[in-house]
Amino acid sequence: DALVFYRLGDFYEMFFEDAKIASCELDLVLTGRNAGVKDRVPMCGVPFHALTGYIQRLVQKGYKVAIVEQMEDPALAKGLVKRDVIKVVTPGTVIDELFDERSSIYLAAVVDYQYGFALSICEMSTGETTVTHIPRNILHLQQTLLKNNIREIVVKEGFDEKFIRAVRDLSAVAISYCAEDQIGEEYLPLCEEVSDGAQREAYGLMLNYLIETQMRMMH
């Protein structure tokens, strides 16, 4: 569900539907290329040195961006150049050069359980994380997200649709999905003080989402 930016020489290129969206949102010229199919493939691009500004604009509009880099020198590659996703930038995980130090970026994982919602909330610039419970109520959920300046929430597939719609009504909050909420053994020391089962599940959901979107760039 992310717009994919492919590094091709001195440019990052987008194709197909991603190109149509990016050209509209970023005021880029939409072109096309022959790719062995009946119709020309829609495409657009941005210079590599201007990438940060374009990603920032997309993230501010609620989009997620996957950055695909060349993993080998094209001059030395045998056949197709090896490429891989090195990072996924989302509204709730935007850090480093894209981060505005004057404002805090908060990501929340929300787990629905019998008596309410369990939340794990992370401030991305410091990594400070809190866990809490709130009543299973649409208005209370909306107020909690707004009060804590949440930019993005992470939920599991199958999360109650009426609450998803309520979050979508808050245009400043993006919604993402993550399937895994189990905490790997190497990360268990991070949540030693979280004993509540639902809160621990929310913490695990958030942690796995961060690993999924951010850890590639650390390898």
Give the predicted meaning of each segment.
Residues 1-219:
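Basic, polar low-complexity surface loops/patches
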